Amino acid sequence: MNGTSPVARSKRKEPPQYSSDGRLAKHHRTNGDIDMSSADANTPTEDFDGHYEEEPRHVLPLAPGADTAEWQATIENVVRNVVSIRFCQTCSFDTDPALTSEATGFVVDAERGYILTNRHVVGSGPFWGYCIFDNHEEVDAYPVYRDPVHDFGILKFDPKAIKYMPVAALPLRPDLARVGIEIRVVGNDAGEKLSILSGVISRLDRNAPEYGDGYSDFNTCYYQASAAASGGSSGSPVVNKDGFAVALQAGGRADGASTDYFLPLDRPLRALKCLQEGKPITRGDIQCQFVLKPFDECRRLGLTPEWEAQVRKAFPKETNMLVAEIILPEGPSHKKLEEGDVLIKVNGKLLTQFIPLEETLDSSVGQTVKLMLLRGGEEVEVEIEVGDLHQITPDRFVSVSGGSFHNLSYQQARLYGVACKGVYVCEAGGSFRFDNNENGWIIQSIDQKETPDLDTFIEVMKGIPDKARVVITYKHLRDMHTLHTTVIYVDRHWAKKMKLAVRNDKTGLWDFSNLSDALPAVAPVPRKASFIQLENTSHPAVADLVKSFVHVSVTMPVKLDGFPKNRKWGMGLVIDAEKGLVIISRAIVPYDLCDITITIADSIVVEGKVVFLHPLQNYAVIQYDPKLVDAPVRSAKLSSEMISQGASTYFIGYNRIGRIVHTATTVTEMFAVTIPANSGAPRYRAVNVDAITVDTNLSGQCGSGVLVAQDGTVQALWLTYLGERNPSSHRDEEYHLGLATPTLLPVISQLQQGITPKLRLLSCEFRAIQMSQARIMGVSEEWIQKVSLVNTAHHQLFLVTKRTYERNEPAGDHLKEGDILLTLNNQLITKISELDVMYSHDYLDAVIVRNTKELHIKLPTVAADDAETDHAISFCGAILHRPHLAVRQQISKLFSEVYVSARTRGSPAYQYGLAPTNFVTHVNGKRTPDLKSFLDAVVGIPDNTYFRLKCMTFDSVPWVVTMKKNEHYFPTTELIKDPSEPLTGWRRITYEGGKKIEGEGHEGVGVAVLGEDQGEGGEGDVDGCC
């Protein structure tokens, strides 16, 4: 890269865009640049020099009449050869994240069906896509070559599939590129089907642009022009007036300048000829990056006047020389070349450009080349063995325990200046989710065994049983000085197979094979431990409460119910040590398709399972095996008396780093809380519950804890409540509030007796109103006086603000929105906790005010058994299940029982715009009212064929999407809750080729549908394949 060159950015397409609330606004998708980060498309990505990347410009095609007749004839011929490429990179690999995008290519061999485009389009990993010709004929395309370094790749299609237009090839003429020639860039600019942009080549000798942390080209020069191309133009032909392709559009600046960068066609032309002749495309390299530097810089590096004179005489028009920039440790050039060496000769020939250097290296794989250099003015001659670039370019990866791995690539090694070796984590999920980084980790060792390469890593993982906890050491490419050491939980039960994917350049697919099934878990053994002592407290009973807290870590392998995270942790309170019952927030344990790890006394680690999920009050009860715990765990004593406003209490909490903090404090308020609903993707939230706040700053720092009396009696739980997503920061709001213990006692009592609580619910949400409002709405003075006498702390009644849609609503009277509730079973309702009477009654006698009239009605309640998800389907990368309770709380009508909860990036669902919060009502015109009918309809669809889905958005807008099925990377999978399953409690069924397979299938990456932590990501969008 030139010293004065500004930062360049690739112009790549981003996935379909949706309205700010995450729901599909229209079924017409807009286009822009690919967001290369894992964050939401609205979040700016930061350049490596600290500046924010700007949105791409939307430019107009060349105005009619601006071209001569000669240009018009040329353009008419060229556009027939240009295709729009729509593609998915189906999973993260090397420098490329899983994504869906559009780009451009052009036919370079009509007889064999070869299309030239960019390497960042073809990608280094699994690719799935198709091309659309000028007459809108569509044909599948697959990669047959992607260059290890340079930004070009070649796709293959079946020419016989194009029936309605003649297919011609665009000749490649790299020799015709000249400074000052007028050119046209013909392609899919800014997502348009066809745009024609004009420009003039201004430079032929700029260094390859750097695109930051992702893929970047190097060891080649680039051309520069002012054409103002934009997203989607990647892979466009750069043609001259005679209709020859003289360069390939690759990238450009995104800071407002209309500067574009073109790849010379010398190396693409050589690769094409090799394919046409059936010869291998040899690629040689010495693991050294060279850059072009002008003579004045070379002089400062040691270029002598004598050699400068010889070079200028041999190349009169030359102004640059090649200088060593980056030399990889342990590579062929290590200890032979040094940074700043000026290259003079290769094999005795004077040389100043990349092309002759590459010609020499590509023809010398496995042989030795002799380089002559100037180092600080001294002549140095070295012999270096030329390596095979294909050998240091990964063409396989392994998926195990939720993560994906391959050998470190030359691209990554060059970017970070490290040795080209090691096991690279390309998808840091499941057991290998380190911090918040999705990739970039290098595994150093697992289970005290070093893992220098992928083969060793595979053998080590084969020997680790399911549910084992092993020590792992790793580094990040950005900081190879720091060695991280931690203990991971090896999950081999959600995805039992260790799968190897190997690139097949003949078919364009990646072939999957099973390397090994999981070893059975080792039976746990009892452990002994003691608790810490809580210091500096004058109340021993309060101090003993630390023996009732346990650390709970939850991992969710599949994203359900709109929940934005795939792992959470918090502190749970032991409510029955003999039975191992623990109570914890539902913001930590949102559903029971999960792995729960409970740590007792910071020492004993045991498994947990979900035994109860409260549908409204934001708590879950989990259980561990107490026989495995030899520690003085104490059951917390829960108060049966309601704590009151102004009462003195003791706050014990755990802060964000898991440290215990405590202080004496006062209850400041008790109120009926309304947790805002998330408009983007409905997910669990607390409803119809009283909340407590206290007068201490520690309460806002702690997501778990208790309020406790001096005698050690727990008066309230301190819980995390999941709220809405902030539209500005794209982060999920969390509220820290107290929940009084008397509310919990009926459920806990049943659980202690071994009874699973069967709750009943009123299908509505209430909001507190003041007496001034109640009077206007028709509440009589008599009732207002009763309220003032019954509840002296809060003069309030409750208004129905929202009805929950019930699938099978019982007959009888029902509350309506706007009703004011006065009594239930003859009890005046002035506290939200008094609604708890509904949990144990099939019917309730109620007095309400409706439309200013007082009514006596008999209210039926509904069973809460229907509140949790127990069946899910993964289809074409979309996760579908019945609309969960949060959906029914926010919607007035269910359009079907097939609800899109999430989707995988790089999948057909993402490519064709099947978004979370959509309902699928028909498949190919056939009604699909439930999951069974949907599954019956889609299983019979042949692979790689189109089908129609009729959908309804959350906001009742009908639309139709056409999708193409892909079973190879995204097999149809069914997850069914089954208590008889000993490991997970869920049964997995896979459908491949119309066959039903118990467990995992042969195809697809062997990891569950793992989502990123959605702190800044798109709601409902997850990474990886299933």
UniProtKB/Swiss-Prot annotation:
E.C. number: 3.4.21.-
The species this protein was found in: Neurospora crassa (strain ATCC 24698 / 74-OR23-1A / CBS 708.71 / DSM 1257 / FGSC 987)
Region (Disordered): 1-51
Functional description taken from the UniProt entry: Nuclear serine protease which mediates apoptosis.
Region (Serine protease): 82-272
Subcellular location: Nucleus
Domain of life of the source: Eukaryota
Enzyme class: hydrolase
Xref: Gene3D superfamilies: 2.30.42.10, 2.40.10.120
Annotated GO biological process: apoptotic process; positive regulation of apoptotic process; proteolysis
Sequence similarity: Belongs to the peptidase S1C family.
Protein's name according to its UniProt entry: Pro-apoptotic serine protease nma111
Keyword terms, alphabetized: Apoptosis, Hydrolase, Nucleus, Protease, Repeat, Serine protease
PDZ domain segment(s): 305-377, 883-955
Record GO cellular component, one term: nucleus
InterPro entries, per database record: PDZ-like_dom, PDZ_sf, Peptidase_S1_PA, Peptidase_S1C
Active-site residues, as the UniProt record annotates them: 120, 151, 233
A GO molecular-function annotation: serine-type endopeptidase activity
